[in-house]
Regions:
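Flexible, glycine-rich beta-alpha linker
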Residues: 3-13, 36-56, 75
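Ser/Thr-glycine-rich phosphate-binding loops at phosphate-binding pockets of nucleotides
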Residues: 1, 17, 171
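Alpha-helical hydrophobic/aromatic positions enriched in membrane-embedded helices and signal peptides
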Residues: 7-10, 31, 72, 86
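C-terminal substrate-binding subdomain of Rossmann-fold SDR/epimerase-dehydratase oxidoreductases
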Residues: 61-176
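Residues in soluble alpha-helical coiled-coils and helical-bundle/repeat scaffolds
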Residues: 30, 48-49, 159
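Active-site Tyr-X1-5-Lys
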Residues: 10-36, 58-63
Length: 176
């Protein structure tokens, strides 16, 4: 995904609010205000509620509990909150415009389950089940940020995401 990607047709109130805000910020900028649109993929933090996927899986794995999930064959671009905050700070010193901030790395639900349960020395296959009621309607199989986003941050600020994939899961697991 990039700033040129087509806006989602998802009618989820959260998505609708994001789209309206994106358009409104552009109007404010056209009127001379110095405002930014910063778009992120999945931002992970131990401070988020327990129903966010990676945190939910890590809690179940740490306490050796079984978990019911939806589609584990989807891929998302997850970033760690402290790195996102650093990227926000860096882009705030640039010209006000739209920025898409993401690690540009994909990770599947299956990999998250496998890694989290391995941290407890467990085989994830014995601790999860998938239920169609948790599948999202019209869900995109792969949602990752364009690698151009990562290259831009690297070239402009010598900044790159270091916490993603296995390390991100370990950070979440350790934080619980």
């Amino acid at each position: 995904m990039s700033l040129k990607s087509k806006l989602s047709s998802n009618r989820n109130p959260y998505v609708v609010a994001q789209q309206k805000t994106f358009r409104l910020i552009k109007k404010y900028r056209d009127e001379g205000l110095s405002v930014y649109n910063l778009i992120f993929m999945q931002v992970e933090s131990p401070l988020r509620s327990n129903d966010f996927f990676i945190k939910k899986v890590c809690i179940a794995a740490k306490y050796k509990k079984k978990i019911i999930v939806g589609n584990i064959n989807t891929y998302r671009d997850y970033s760690w909150v402290t790195e996102i905050i650093k990227a926000i700070f860096l882009t705030s010193n640039l010209k006000a415009q739209d920025y898409f901030i993401s690690a540009g790395k994909k990770m599947s639900g299956k990999k998250i389950l496998k890694k989290a349960y391995s941290l407890s020395n467990l085989n994830y296959k014995n601790y999860f089940s998938s239920n169609k009621k948790y599948f999202r309607i019209n869900e995109n199989e792969i949602l990752i940020g364009s690698v151009k986003n990562s290259f831009y941050l690297k070239n402009k600020f010598n900044f790159s995401f270091k916490i993603f994939g296995d390390r991100l899961i370990k950070e979440m697991y350790k934080s619980l």
